[in-house]
């Protein structure tokens, strides 16, 4: 009889920042002969994305509470308990050797269910400030890992697992060598876009004209409006500037290869990808009570690879002045500094902890 494959259940959902790092670890362990199963929710992005990657997915019913009102808060304990029992049934049927929690609503009930079944939980916090669910789960997890220092006092810093195509990009010295002319500005508002960038960057194009070429990911439903804003600002200032606006960039590695500098939010995965790619950045952190995105971006600013502009301080002039002050020599230095702080073997580090925990 052949030996039973090791089994991992990945708990991750809701946003690309949770799902893509989970997929990176899943694919790595599949290449090592592991069987992978995913725990998610049927109405979030993992339901479409994970099966496309050849991984079987199971669902529990759970959602966030923010903005749901008093009735939802009262019903929450019952819904959470039901979700835990749904997850327990899945765990008992699949019998994983370890469970990896990468974040999203599903991780809370899934982590408790795994712990109650005696299955070791490995927790990975992608952000510089730990979310409430991960703070709770850290008390029952076998191992806790963090992408950035500061989320947990004593957890090892392993970085964020990044997609292979981003890791495969040329080093900045090769990629940026010989470039001249307009600075190539990549604008990323996250998979959902960022309205403030959609409103601000067309004005920046109007201020800088032919000095910049812009590739702008506007987010779902925002492409037409953002294109119109570019047209109006360039016409108003009687200047020309090349720009491309899309709802979503399917091949982000190609976009990083093209870019000289990135203007974006500072979600955990975005920051980690920009560091791995070796790109200078202007980060505009999403305003959250924990300032989570600010802390994500701070290591790159401290390294001299980026500038953080808080949303309250954001003006078109602030971005335009920053871009004008960064000549090509400066951009090259910043790109190399960004890559110097990247943790490029994060996938292997997380996978090795899972392998270690599963053997015990």
From Swiss-Prot:
Q: Name one GO biological process term.
A: peptidoglycan biosynthetic process
Q: Which pathway does it operate in?
A: Cell wall biogenesis; peptidoglycan biosynthesis
Mention one GO molecular function.
Answer: UDP-N-acetyl-D-glucosamine:N-acetylmuramoyl-L-alanyl-D-glutamyl-meso-2,6-diaminopimelyl-D-alanyl-D-alanine-diphosphoundecaprenol 4-beta-N-acetylglucosaminlytransferase activity
Q: Which reaction does it catalyse?
A: di-trans,octa-cis-undecaprenyl diphospho-N-acetyl-alpha-D-muramoyl-L-alanyl-D-glutamyl-meso-2,6-diaminopimeloyl-D-alanyl-D-alanine + UDP-N-acetyl-alpha-D-glucosamine = di-trans,octa-cis-undecaprenyl diphospho-[N-acetyl-alpha-D-glucosaminyl-(1->4)]-N-acetyl-alpha-D-muramoyl-L-alanyl-D-glutamyl-meso-2,6-diaminopimeloyl-D-alanyl-D-alanine + UDP + H(+)
Give the E.C. number(s). 2.4.1.227
Q: Which UniProt keywords apply?
A: Cell cycle, Cell division, Cell inner membrane, Cell membrane, Cell shape, Cell wall biogenesis/degradation, Glycosyltransferase, Membrane, Peptidoglycan synthesis, Transferase
* InterPro entries documented for this protein: GlcNAc_MurG (IPR006009), Glyco_trans_28_C (IPR007235), GlycoTrans_28_N (IPR004276)
- Compartment annotation: Cell inner membrane
Q: State the annotated membrane topology for this chain.
A: Peripheral membrane protein
Indicate whether DNA repair appears among the record's keywords: no
Residues where UDP-N-acetyl-alpha-D-glucosamine binds: 15-17, 127, 163, 191, 249, 268-273, 293
A GO-annotated cellular component: plasma membrane
Q: Where are its TM segments located?
A: none
Task: List the disulfide bonds in this chain.
Answer: none
Enzyme class, UniProt record, top EC level:
transferase
Taxonomically, the superkingdom here is Bacteria
Q: Say what the protein does.
A: Cell wall formation. Catalyzes the transfer of a GlcNAc subunit on undecaprenyl-pyrophosphoryl-MurNAc-pentapeptide (lipid intermediate I) to form undecaprenyl-pyrophosphoryl-MurNAc-(pentapeptide)GlcNAc (lipid intermediate II).
UniProt-listed HAMAP family:
MurG
> Which family is annotated?
Belongs to the glycosyltransferase 28 family. MurG subfamily.
Which named protein is this?
A: UDP-N-acetylglucosamine--N-acetylmuramyl-(pentapeptide) pyrophosphoryl-undecaprenol N-acetylglucosamine transferase
